[in-house]
């Protein structure tokens, strides 16, 4: 039985002038790496974009995507009302969540709570049951309902409940903060807005402002612990989800200031590996920042990634069990394939690896 199986996704993607992920001052997020300032897009921002893509691009069924919200009471109330219209759904929903150990009041739960559609239905079904005699057993049943049947995105990204760690789910996927492969200096766009109803003899602007932005070639990385995913979802579903995760990670993008910059791009190159030892982030390829040249940043970044991976496999890490690339420039690591073909082959490869190796 294989105890370890990981799928690593490495993406190089060039983004034009943009501000897709801002800090508290409105500036594009940055990080110091290799002694220089890099553009940065947070892990949270890209995971949110991926969860949206799961639904908007029909990569997962809606039932497979959970809700992260403080309005859990309302979700359970709605389900109770559908099951038992004659009962006081609002009162029953609050009581049910209290018994389940989820603190809530008229404003909702104290903190955001990640819950699946199946868990909502299970809580509602228990709430309308008329044969409740053992209150302790009932509360345990409510807790069990919240521990079973996670949505796909809960299985992927995990759930943390500070008030009750027994409801936590360990994430099967990790998504790194994306950083530019080169040094970046933020710039400012000074803009004016015209008042369409301004008098003709007043030529001044109706509004003045600035917006901060940068452009970058980003290195993006994510990994999926396939055995952990299989433990929650089963072998066949896990393989399908790895494919959906890969497509969402590769094609999605956070939406910050997108109407201002129209910065939606697709990757320049993708490198995917199946590993049986550990996940391997290849950001070390860019610890020495790629220098500006007439070639731009994308092509030198591909060369740096390819050379670093080859060197790493010769010294510290075993070569991947299987490798795939999309786009040009990384063919020395694996033959290039169209994206959809690569994802299909990846799904089949994961299925093959899981056959006979299911977690019991």
Question: Where would I find each of the regions flagged by the language model?
Answer:
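Basic polyanion-binding and macromolecular-assembly surfaces
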Residues: 1-40, 44-360
């Amino acid at each position: 039985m294989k105890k370890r199986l990981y799928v690593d996704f490495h993406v190089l993607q060039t983004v034009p002038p943009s501000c897709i992920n801002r800090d508290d001052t409105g500036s594009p997020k940055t990080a110091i790496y290799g002694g220089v300032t890099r553009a940065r897009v947070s892990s949270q921002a890209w995971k949110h974009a991926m969860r949206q893509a799961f639904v908007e691009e029909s990569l997962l069924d809606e039932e497979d995507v959970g809700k992260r919200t403080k309005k859990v009471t309302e979700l359970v109330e709605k389900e109770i009302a559908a099951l038992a219209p004659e009962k006081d759904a609002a009162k029953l929903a609050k009581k049910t969540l209290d018994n389940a150990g989820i603190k809530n009041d008229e404003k909702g739960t104290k903190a955001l709570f990640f819950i699946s559609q199946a868990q909502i239905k299970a809580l509602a079904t228990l709430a309308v049951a008329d044969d409740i005699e053992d209150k302790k057993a009932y509360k345990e049943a409510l807790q069990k309902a919240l521990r079973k049947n996670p949505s796909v995105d809960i299985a992927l990204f995990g759930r943390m409940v500070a008030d009750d760690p027994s409801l936590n789910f360990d994430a099967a996927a990790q998504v790194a903060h994306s950083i530019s492969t080169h040094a970046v200096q933020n710039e400012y766009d000074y803009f004016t807005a015209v008042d369409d109803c301004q008098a003709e003899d007043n030529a001044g602007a109706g509004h003045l402002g600035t917006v901060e932005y940068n452009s970058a070639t980003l290195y993006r990385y994510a990994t999926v612990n396939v055995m952990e995913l299989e433990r929650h979802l089963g072998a066949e579903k896990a393989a399908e989800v790895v494919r959906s995760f890969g497509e969402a990670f590769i094609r999605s993008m956070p939406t910050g200031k997108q109407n201002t910059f129209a910065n939606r791009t697709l990757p320049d190159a993708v490198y995917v590996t199946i590993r049986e030892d550990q996940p391997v982030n290849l950001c070390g390829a860019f610890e020495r920042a790629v220098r500006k040249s007439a070639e731009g940043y994308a092509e030198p970044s591909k060369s740096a990634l390819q050379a670093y991976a080859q060197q790493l496999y010769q010294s510290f890490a075993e070569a991947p069990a299987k490798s795939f690339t999309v786009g040009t420039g990384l063919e020395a690591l694996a033959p290039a394939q169209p994206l959809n073909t690569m994802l299909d082959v990846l799904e089949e490869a994961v299925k093959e690896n899981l056959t006979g190796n299911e977690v019991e």
